[in-house]
């Protein structure tokens, strides 16, 4: 009896403590701590080692296809992507599919993320970013090839595929739980990583540009942000509710425009600062193995340079997460390996071209970089404005808005596929698009920092079931690749 009394008393004291200290605050701190620990794992060294390891394994097993067949990749992607071709019902053209995938991967990280990697890891981080992209090309090739090979038609007659389908159809029912986990993590990711954080970037870019030119005052920003959120929500709804055809049509117009727009201006920075270019290349290669010369670091700086470069390459092109393969699965093609070539091209365009040009803007412009301190888009903006003048801030705002909007569209498609797979019902897609569009308004007006951080963690967790599937299905990738090139050789 006395034991029961003591237990009851202790429980009462504990409850009183929670009330006094604030149960909500304690729970919030606990969630934050747990989320941070998991986030550090899935976006940290263990995850990077796994992703790089899978990319290396696939590269070895395919004979480093991404290097050996790179001329063929260019021939079958850039060489054919502008040919006019109508897709069959329920599908996109291969070009529309790669543009939709690029819409999801080419985002604000290409501007802000690269700047952060250079600021912390030094110029040598660019070299390690290239290395990770080289292996990521083969990872993305495998993801796309498997997605097209194991895809299926939904009730609406549309092609659906991606990691959850190549797990389901490639590994069998005993691995079904991995497909469910992948889709669940995906649904918990799309509203934060794919939507709200992107809208927040759009709002911040517009606010900064308008304040700089005194178009509006600080007092009007809350109203302006609401208007921007509503406009973005309406545009997102118009695109997504138009179905797979409209998503593909918008992507094939928006992505090439924004990429070319950014590339031309970035190349201009390099050309106008051409005398610095050889020195920048020297800094990249020398800094890869001796970053202390630039960052002022000591023993740990080489590891930091590698970590920042590799992580930026992985996080930018999403090789290992499997998301881009969902868009590629919509392509009107009968040859999985040929669509896989677009996966290689996707990583090349995202990381080798766009991320590298961002690095060149920062390093060639001659701006002062405070190595060892965190930085973001402001470093890239400074590189443009130093070369072109103050008007370049407007250009950067436009680029950020385009990159962010395209990401919202791409992740909207991914989210609909995740939810339909979980619910075994395509009727949830349109209501999802409505809710997803509405989140754009919240992203523009409400600070939900912890929720978006949790979404980022779930985004990282998506890599675990996908990497397991890639390992188990690597033999299928090798066989499909051998059969494809044997057929190509036989047909001349």
Whereabouts are the PLM-identified features?
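Helix-loop-helix module between adjacent transmembrane segments
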Residues: 58-59, 132-157, 164, 168-200, ...
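Membrane-interface loop-to-helix entry segments
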Residues: 50, 54-57, 61-74, 199-206, ...
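Extracellular/periplasmic helix-exit of transmembrane alpha-helices
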Residues: 143-155, 267-283, 294-297, 330-333, ...
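Alpha-helical membrane segments and immediately flanking helix-loop junctions
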Residues: 85-120, 146-170, 181-187, 299-348
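Membrane-embedded translocation segments of transport machinery
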Residues: 242-245, 249-252, 257-324, 329, ...
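Transmembrane helix-loop junctions in multi-pass membrane proteins
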Residues: 28-31, 61-66, 109-114, 192-202, ...
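N-terminal alpha-helical transmembrane segments of multi-pass membrane transport
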Residues: 14, 18-108, 118-125, 136, ...
